[in-house]
Amino acid sequence: MKILLIKDVKTLGKAGEVKEVKDGYGQNFLIAKGFAKHATAEILAQHKEDERIAAENLAKEIVSLKDLATKLDKAEIVITKKLGQNGHLFGSITKDEVAHALLEQHNVEIDKKHITDKLSIKTAGKHDLDLRLGHGIHATLHVDVVGE
């Protein structure tokens, strides 16, 4: 019996794979428990169409992330903080502050988890932050910290 796995099965394979299994195992366990569907021509055609659509969506997402990376590489944000003696900040710049400043100044919303550096910005001046946007795409954001 041919089946199409809907969920990962540790001993059999990953979701989306077509496998040949014994009739009893396929019917009584895999299909009954919702791990697989009987691999008919219609189901296989639908699965192939779903994979094609997913690949197109992934390609569109990668293009948009590359455009965002290009935009971020050219962008510079300015963060104003109180300075102590010798140009040191009271506290440090947080990922939330960087994400908020990027949204306010360039209308670009990113999740703070994309900022990979540990953000040890404790002095005024220009700093570069590495951003990982996903799918192996990186950008460098230029941050200028100025005192009040």
Swiss-Prot record:
Role played: Binds to the 23S rRNA.
Assigned GO CC terms: ribonucleoprotein complex; ribosome
Species, as recorded: Sulfurimonas denitrificans (strain ATCC 33889 / DSM 1251)
GO BP terms in the entry: translation
Superkingdom: Bacteria
Family statement: Belongs to the bacterial ribosomal protein bL9 family.
Pfam families on file: Ribosomal_L9_C (PF03948), Ribosomal_L9_N (PF01281)
Annotated HAMAP family: Ribosomal_bL9
Keywords: Ribonucleoprotein, Ribosomal protein, RNA-binding, rRNA-binding
Disulfide bonding pattern of the chain: none
Gene Ontology MF, one: structural constituent of ribosome
The protein, known as: Large ribosomal subunit protein bL9
